[in-house]
Design a protein with these regions (language model features):
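Phosphate/oxyanion-binding loops and surfaces in catalytic or ligand/nucleic-acid-binding neighborhoods
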Residues: 112-115, 340, 344
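Acidic/His-rich, divalent-metal-binding segments that scaffold phosphate/diphosphate chemistry
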Residues: 114-239, 250-253, 261
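Short gly/ser/thr-rich secondary-structure transition/capping motifs
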Residues: 25-27, 192, 276-278
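Alpha-helical scaffolding flanking metal-ion-dependent phosphate/phosphodiester catalytic sites
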Residues: 187, 207-222, 233-335, 343-346
Length: 346
């Protein structure tokens, strides 16, 4: 996917949202095109079409042969008839307001990319991704987290878990190009499937999934240069990363709109039963059951994810690594987690 914009310094949220569909390349409208630009499934323009120079620059960019048959979604900052006509004149396949809510934007992109219709799992995934995007954007900007949107994401993830098709969920998660979104969606999907496997009633399932959705909210305040670094973090960068549990806890506590267990999961999902975790070195019964579940899902997710500095573990090896952690994790819950990721006889 290619995002063409005249305000690249303000495009981070949109880029992250578009990365749901795979790699999103961002192009500054007024800079020469890079020689390695690849064919794209969709072009998205976020440009002020009230400026003649911008219109001509977009027209010139879209005239390149490789883009002539590529769908073009034009985001308008002003929905006036004149600019809508201008967007159509430069070949827009669809025109939407630039401030459209994330869910509506992703729905429209889905219709463009999948004109034959979506499978239910895709709809659940898009709804969850849109909520995740709004949540992380609000956290990064220091705004109140969108409670209703987060609740909608939790519902979407739980409905996806009802289908007992974790493999399809994982396949869609892997298409997301942003590592933080990918990890949050992966942990949330695993946690929802875990609660479903344990036969939890609906309210308990919502609590577990909500805790997983929010567990890494503190990472929204970690500099992107550290989060997106190609390679292992330095000691100093690791120290910054290790602040995210306390940051997330304080953020959720301050807003006062989330379950106590979810707030605790944000702070304690890196704690271990033997006291070797962080940030507080909790032991045993000091770590609630919901947090123990999220921790298992978080570790498993990290093991099967691909990063620039490591290859992903296959499911069997990742589960074996959980077992090998012994007294750090709840052994009963680790055993109960097995059917979630390794269906079939033990």
């Amino acid at each position: 996917m290619l995002l063409i914009t005249d305000r690249p310094e303000q495009s981070a949220k949109l880029e992250r949202l578009l990365s749901l569909w795979g790699r999103c390349d961002v192009v500054d409208l007024y800079r020469p095109a890079a020689g390695d630009e690849r064919p794209q499934r969709l072009l998205v323009s976020d440009v002020d079409l009230s400026k003649r120079a911008a219109v001509e620059a977009v027209r010139h960019r879209l005239a390149e042969r490789r883009y002539r048959k590529t769908p073009h979604l034009c985001l308008l900052r002003d929905q006036s008839p004149r600019l809508t006509t201008q967007a159509n004149a430069i070949g827009a396949s669809a025109v939407l307001p630039a401030d459209l809510p994330s869910k509506a934007l992703l729905d429209e992109i889905g219709r463009i990319l999948h004109p034959q219709g979506w499978a239910p799992m895709q709809r659940h995934f898009v709804a969850a991704s849109a909520g995740m995007a709004d949540m992380l954007s609000a956290a990064a900007d220091g705004r109140a987290l969108p409670v209703a949107t987060i609740e909608d994401s939790v519902d979407a993830i739980n409905r996806a878990a009802d289908d007992h098709d974790l493999g399809t969920w994982l396949d869609m998660v892997w298409t997301h190009d942003d590592a933080t979104y990918q990890h949050c969606l992966l942990v949330a999907g695993l946690a929802a499937a875990f609660a479903c496997e344990l036969g939890f009633p609906e309210e308990a399932r919502r609590l577990v999934t909500c805790s997983a959705v929010l567990h890494d909210i503190g990472k929204a305040r970690v500099p992107l240069a550290i989060l997106h670094k190609r390679g292992k973090p330095t000691r100093e960068e690791l120290a910054v990363l290790r602040e995210h549990p306390q940051t997330g806890y304080e953020m959720l506590l301050r807003q006062g709109a989330f379950p106590r267990e979810a707030v605790e999961a944000a702070r304690s999902h890196h704690e271990y039963l033997d006291g070797s975790g962080y940030p507080r070195g909790l032991k045993g019964d000091e770590i609630p059951d919901v947090v123990r579940m999220v921790t298992i899902c978080d570790i498993y997710a990290a093991l099967i994810e691909r990063r620039s500095y490591k290859v992903p573990m296959p499911p069997e090896a990742a589960y074996a690594a959980l077992v090998a952690m012994g007294g750090k994790l709840d052994a009963d819950l680790v055993r109960a987690f097995r059917p979630v990721v390794l269906p079939g006889p033990a």
